[in-house]
Amino acid sequence: LMEVKAEVKDALLIKETQVHSKQGDDAKEAGNDNKNVTAYPQTEGVSERVIAQKQAGRYAVAYHPVGGMVPAQKFEEIYAVIKDAANAEVRVAPDETLYIINLEEEQAERIHKITADGAKNLFETSVSCIGSTVCQIGLRDSQGLLASIVEAVEPYHFADGVLPRIHISGCPSSCGTHQIGKLGFRGASKSVNGKAEPAFAFYVNGQDAQGEERFGEEWGIMLATDIPKFFIELGKVISEKKLSYERWYENNQDALKEIAATYLQ
């Protein structure tokens, strides 16, 4: 177990946070640039994006645009800051997060401001494939689904961690890794009054942590139009308990089934 203490100065407007991440023995070796940045968000509900590296005075900034969709001009803005920075790099994680690493304090502050349009809470770091609007074999618009959920829950201002990171795939190809999400969705269809309607299969309790790997259990099919309503109701229930989704789910699997049953076909 490796503890990473992020100590950033007031100019970055980021609170100190302790981060715990499972790493192998090799990750304890000092001075290795490849092992200075751990996964973001580090723990449920943590939104701090500036990470102090092992090297004194060096920082990394995590940037997760909603749905992994980076505005084209954003790369130009980032490049303008890091082009003359020694050893600065932009790395892409499998969960669609960008890490801009090996930054000095002033550079980290500028990158932090430039990337302020990214995810502001755990739920907005949800993973989605590109979806049927671009993918030729995609069945459903996974990006559109994520955008509609984010828009629907935004007015409720749920506390960070109340809604979990979800994974959305537009089809069985599983590019959104829906099987490993705490809540996952996979593109499907549902017949309503004899007409095929856009829908998603619903998966629960997936996990990709080393040693705890498991696929989520498929619970049924939800119409795409019902999924935002499901998350609004779920967020309200968990908010009343003043818990995060993870803590709430530990003792409320049956309650989740009751909420989902309203929307499952």
Cite the ranges covered by each PLM segment.
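Peripheral terminal and linker regions in Fe-S/redox and tRNA-modifying enzymes
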Residues: 1-265
